[in-house]
Design a protein with these regions (language model features):
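Extracellular, repeat-based ectodomains that mediate carbohydrate processing or recognition
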Residues: 1-143
Length: 143
């Protein structure tokens, strides 16, 4: 399966990120230019998250053993994070606020149910995942 994400920076630069055959690539899209794609990371799952903040492009991806955070400012750097993203993950969102880091992801737990989880870093340590439905209960309401 190929996944594609478009990202526009505050400098009006447009980037295409995509997954293909175990790797994540990015390509700058520019008028009248054919820029070759660059492989960012290999041996990863097809679930990844991309965002732009303070002049940097960030990419969160998952290998068999770790989550990996990549950062771009004219050059890609990566850092292994001390947690894994479940193989059953179907969607992923990563965010920062002041000095906190958290990510939200969905996991299909059986044929009919998909659940949202949140995981965050507190005091330089990753907390255990929390089911969002356990934080924000809607009860048995059908409305």
């Amino acid at each position: 399966m190929n996944r594609y994400i478009l990202l526009k920076t505050d400098k009006n630069e447009l980037y295409l990120f995509y997954y293909s055959e175990g790797s994540i690539y990015f390509k700058q899209l520019a008028k009248n230019q054919n820029i070759s794609p660059i492989k960012i990371i290999s041996d990863v799952s097809d679930i990844f998250s991309v965002w732009y903040e303070n002049g940097f492009i960030y990419l969160l991806a998952s290998t068999d053993s770790n989550a990996v955070l990549c950062r771009y400012n004219r050059k890609w750097n990566s850092k292994k994070l001390n947690f894994t993203i479940p193989n059953e993950c179907t969607k992923l969102f990563f965010t920062t606020a002041e000095n906190s880091i958290s990510f939200i992801y969905s996991v299909k737990e059986n044929h009919n149910n998909e659940y949202l989880y949140m995981r965050y870093m507190l005091d330089d340590r990753w907390e255990q995942p929390i089911k969002i439905s356990e934080i924000l209960s809607f009860g048995n309401s059908s409305e």
